[in-house]
Amino acid sequence: MRKKQDKNIEKISKVKVFLNTPNENWIVDRLTDEWMINNPEISTVNLKSSNLLWIISPWTINSIPEKELKKRKVFCTIHHIDEEKFNFFEKKKFKRLDALVDQYHVISDQTENSLRQLTEKPIWNNPWWIDQSKWFKIKDPSRIRKEIGIQSEAFIIGSFQRDTEGKDLKSPKLSKGPDRLIEMILYYKNQQSKLQVVLTGKRRQYVINKLKENNINYLYFEMTDINLLNKLYNS
């Protein structure tokens, strides 16, 4: 039994994971950084020295030569699948990706169900980790509200993801549910006299325009750092 455990430890110690960081200054870059910091013994920034490729940003897979992908085991994260946009060209792109991937990773049941209709490869459904040094409860939310500029007695609705299509910067990105968000905001506008909406992230034009049309008070922090984002969650 001891020999078997030693062999397993030795096998794990030989794993060298390379992640294809998108360099977009967004959530996937943060996840990549956290992985590298917490798993230095099995991680590498050198593609050539890796034996496992984690395609954490499949939209940038073309930055890795296909010959390098074929030399190694490939583990690929699919963050979500927008079925309404999954046309002939998207299916063709996925078919090429699927030929190179050994196993997939998803973070939700919905994405797993969609992905199972497209591939026979193994799928691991597991949410992202939480770094509790960055995400934690703040005991005095009233102080945070004052610091940020949120009304002390306000009823807050927060939305921290993009909602607008990049092609025209005005059409709703329906897979993110901005139309449903506006419905909820309008409902609470009639219920709460001190409603205030807090937004972060890029491409919020659709929601912002709807808030202006309906004379709804809002705050917008386009690209926040982790410290401020944690404060917003606590407010």
Task: Show the residue positions of the predicted features.
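A short beta-strand/loop micro-motif in the catalytic core of glycosyltransferases
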Residues: 53-54, 59, 100-109, 124, ...
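Conserved catalytic-core segment of nucleotide-activated headgroup transferases in glycan assembly
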Residues: 141-212
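A conserved, positively charged/aromatic
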Residues: 87-102
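Active-site proximal beta-strand in glycosyltransferases
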Residues: 49-57, 67-85, 104-106
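Donor nucleotide-sugar binding/catalytic pocket of nucleotide-sugar-dependent glycosyltransferases
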Residues: 102-116, 120-138, 156, 160
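Active-site donor-binding acidic/aromatic loop of nucleotide-activated sugar
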Residues: 196-200, 215-228
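N-terminal pre-catalytic "stem/leader" segment of glycosyltransferase-like enzymes
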Residues: 1-66
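Short alpha-helical donor nucleotide-sugar binding micro-motif in glycosyltransferases
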Residues: 230-235
